[in-house]
Amino acid sequence: MKLLYDLLPVILFFLAYKFYGALPPEWILAVGVWLPVALEPDNPGHAIYLATAVAMVVMAVQLALGLAIKRRLETMPLLTAAVILVLGGATLWLHDPVFILWKPTLVNWLFALVFMAPPLFGRRTLVETLMGHALSVPRAIWSRVNLAWVVFFLVSGLANLFVAYTFSEAVWVDFKLFGMLGMTFVFVIGQAVYLGLHHREDDPHTTKGDPS
């Protein structure tokens, strides 16, 4: 359920884009009143603007709910929201989809920085911090997995740019949901297998429960 909640902005972006032409014209015109771009129901090129606005609203609502319920905002969702709101706003104000096309790339590269930062300052890797309570593996393995995440995020960002600038906008919208979700799923499965191979119960040389 949490995965679906986290993916909600991406899913609704996809649906708003794909079904733009099927929406009642009066709905589109009503939404356009609130946007800096005047939406034209018979203009397929405006689908990206409606989709962007939908994603921005959903992300803002999620942030507000998270703050109201948990009284705090987690780093990753906050970074994602900041990028969506800034680039989405630029897309709408400047009437240029190129900004929202860069959103997955910037989010992935920011995540890469987040995963890189702790070891650079002599701290535990983020992967170990998040999963060390559940798995006992050597610290060297945590470092490799953390590095793998950094590489994955960098490659994902490059893949997004390749698709965005090589194929049509419609293909990019498909890739944004299915391609990136598929890449992430395969990577997570591979990580789980790798960690499972190195997991050792009650091994004194592992890091489970190590507070350092």
From Swiss-Prot:
It holds the Pfam family IspA. It is found in: Cell inner membrane. Keywords: Cell inner membrane, Cell membrane, Membrane, Transmembrane, Transmembrane helix. One of its GO terms (cellular component) is plasma membrane. The keyword Repressor does not apply. InterPro entries: YciB. It is a multi-pass membrane protein. The chain crosses the membrane at residues 19-39, 47-67, 82-102, 105-122, 147-167, 177-197. Plays a role in cell envelope biogenesis, maintenance of cell envelope integrity and membrane homeostasis. Belongs to the YciB family. NCBIfam families: PRK00259.1-3. This is Inner membrane-spanning protein YciB. The lineage of its organism: Bacteria, Pseudomonadati, Pseudomonadota, Gammaproteobacteria, Chromatiales. The gene is yciB.
